[in-house]
Amino acid sequence: MHEITLSQRALEIIEQQAQQAGARRVTGVWLKVGAFSCVEASALTFCFELVCRGTLAEGCELHIAEQQAECWCERCQQYVHLVSQHVRRCPLCNNDQLQIVADDGLQIQRLELE
C-alpha cells in the first residue's frame, strides 16, 4: 500500500506550506490523482487521516479528484485523454501505440489555511 507513503510526503509539503504562510491550521486539502497512478481514493483518505493526527492538518477536509491520463498518439499526431488504464487505445484512430505524457501521480492542487 503506497498510499501511506504518498500521504506522508503530501503532509510534509502541506505542513511546510502552512508554516511558511503562518497558518495555525489546515482546514482543506485538494489533491489530484492520476488515472494510472494505482492510488485507491478510499485507501488514500484513510492513510491521510491517519498521518494527519496530531498535526496542523488534523481534521482537515480532503478533496480528491482524478486526472485523466494525457497521451501522445504517433499515428494521428494528437494528444488524447484516457480515463482507464485498461483501455490504452487512441480514441481517434484506435492505435495502441500511445506514449503517456501526463499522469502526474499525486499533486497538491490547493490548500485552505487558517
From Swiss-Prot:
Ni(2+) binds at H2. InterPro entries: Hydgase_Ni_incorp_HypA/HybF_CS, HypA/HybF. GO terms for biological process: protein maturation; protein modification process. It comes from the Bacteria. The keyword Protease does not apply. Coiled coil: none annotated. Zn(2+) binds at C73, C76, C90, C93. Keywords: Metal-binding, Nickel, Zinc. GO terms for molecular function: nickel cation binding; zinc ion binding. Pfam families: HypA. NCBIfam families: hypA, PRK03681.1, PRK12380.1. Belongs to the HypA/HybF family. Involved in the maturation of [NiFe] hydrogenases. Required for nickel insertion into the metal center of the hydrogenase. This is Hydrogenase maturation factor HypA. It comes from Klebsiella pneumoniae (strain 342).
